[in-house]
Amino acid sequence: MIEIFLFVNPIGPICYQVEKEPLENLTKYRKKIHLQILPLVNLTSVGVSMEYLSMDKTDLLLRNDQTKLIYTASLDYKAAQLQGKKIARDFLLKLQQHVGVDKKAYSEQLVQELFSETRGDLTMFLEDRQSELVKKNFLTDQTVAKDMGITITPSAVVYNFACEREYGVLLEGAMALASLPALCETSDDQFAFLERKNALKKPTLSTLQGVDHKLILL
């Protein structure tokens, strides 16, 4: 079995490309892979987002607004997760496409329109958005990210249980994530090669304990 933790900016254009392209190549491993997509909000990820959008990172008001925006989008994504893997991933990709790529304003109307397109329960979604459960799930994701040493988005941690290792491989940034399909091969030699090539950190399996394995997206 392969366990993948993918950390993203829920309205990030770079994260959109990472999810849409490389992850589509993982479908042939569908029976072996458990994928979890977790939103990440921290100073570094917000800074990267601002830089990509040509925002002044020294503008504290602008930084605060961007942080709140990513946080709100993260809660919306976590609320969508409560309605299942297909709805959540569809909603996430729509958010990233419209807000991150097309640069539409993140608004109540847009969120409702995009969620309605997923065929999820809109009334339930609106109730869940600010619920304590959703906030708790979001904070759990931030704890997992911290334990795994995640600082930027997109990043991923891959556990290949077919290899004799009790740690995962950390891929930081879009370029590193190009190695994701190769890490899903069950060859121990291949895993070791990519591990050396990327000089990656080694998160321990203990970090898996804080993750809700019911929220599996692939």
Q: What are the language-model segments listed below?
A:
Residues 17-103:
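Structural alpha/beta surface segment adjacent to cysteine/selenocysteine redox centers
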Residues 9-19:
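Short, thiol/selenol-centered motifs that function as redox-active sites or metal-ligating centers
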Residues 13, 44, 165:
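Flexible, glycine-rich phosphate/dinucleotide-binding loops
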Residues 1-6, 32:
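N-terminal cysteine/histidine-rich coordination modules
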Residues 11, 81-84, 131:
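Short beta->alpha junction loops/turns
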Residues 2, 52, 65-97, 185-218:
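Generic hydrophobic segment detector
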Residues 5-7, 21-26, 102-218:
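C-terminal cap of thioredoxin/glutaredoxin-like
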